[in-house]
Amino acid sequence: MLETWRWFGPDDPVSLEQIRQAGATGVVSSLSHIPTGEVWPLVDIEAHKQLIESAGLVWSVVESVPLHNDIKTRSGHYRQLISNYQKTLINLGAAGIHTVCYNFMPVVDWTRTNLEYVLPDNSQALRFDIVDFAVYDIFVLQRSGATDSYDKAVVEGARARFEGLDQPAVAALENNIIAGLPGGEGSYDRAGILAAINHFNQFDNEAYRQNLIAFLRDIMPAAEIADINMVIHPDDPPFSLFGLPRVLSTAEDVRKLVAAVPSASNGLTLCAGSFGARGDNNLVAMAKEFGDRIHFVHLRNIKRESDGSFYESAHLEGDNDIVGLIAALLAVEAKDTSGQRAIAMRPDHGHTLTSEQADPRLKPGYSYGGRMKGLAELRGVIHALTALGTGERS
């Protein structure tokens, strides 16, 4: 597997030198300074690539080329925006970059309610608490019909919790949910997110899936010409938020997408933490079934709770069989007759250790020490399984 590291560009508090010292050889990055929907000029792509290569690293994966909401809703200027997206793919291919991660989540990107969840060792993790989310949705945002999106016990728990919150606590919760997390697509204020929700709530899951399929059919010719694998990231979390549709939360969702768009350029990002937040997703089975579509992997673990809440645990601890997943992915690589296939992998998120907790530049989930620790643990698993013989564990 190819060890990679998410880098947010020159303003990232983690330098390229630090990434190399952590042992990664590939970089996962994007041109975040270019507004969503505009073409990425080849000269900008080449400059970013050269910056990475000057540090002795390789730009392995683009994460991501974000999708404008007009594309997701097939409205407004979506035809021009799709044309721009096609041109960006052609330019990336010309620069020798052949893996592009993207997502089709409506309104909010990956979402957490607590960015500083304290663990027993005093390190900090990211947490999604369904009751806290319901507090915001029902009592702060006051979305119409919000109570219908939750079980009665969650609604009552949210009511009681909201009554105990002061204004600073409400503001902090709102900021966590709608201000935008690293790599996410922008941020909202309260009026803005309500307007966006209303814009998307015309779609149920199937109608929204058809928009995704239409987008892929539009861009596949360009992706094929550019020799680019479009690797969709699953919904995070893999269930509806704000009553909005979800179209990539389960193995069945992946099957439907592959069947509708069979092009070899239609690939998958296997995010263990996203898919794994649902107990009915078998990550090892998914790696076996979709191995030929998987070109990028986010290795992360979680601890699930019965009401749908979860927190991000250490990489080798939690409810996901990360060792079994890595074994299955190594078996996928071994089946390649050329012997050249190396699936790009990054340690997805990491705990914030004591030494970084006071750093105001820290991006939630993207500490240096926590990710370096995770990468070292994952590397150890890969080396051990390789020494024992690639393939699935008995």
Named regions from a protein language model:
Residues 39-60:
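Glycine-rich, positively charged N-terminal anion/phosphate-binding segment
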Residues 30-46, 109, 242:
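Glycine-rich, proline-tolerant flexible connector loops at the mouths of alpha/beta enzymes
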Residues 115-207:
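Extended, charge-rich helix/loop segments that form flexible
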Residues 31, 61-63, 101-106, 234:
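Glycine-rich, histidine-containing beta strand-loop boundary motifs that form or position
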Residues 13-36:
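N-terminal ordered "arm"
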Residues 2, 9, 17-20, 53, ...:
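Histidine-acidic metal/acid-base catalytic patches
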Residues 64-72, 103-112:
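Aromatic-lined carbohydrate-binding surfaces of glycoside hydrolases
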Residues 21-25, 56-72:
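A short glycine/small-residue-enriched secondary-structure motif
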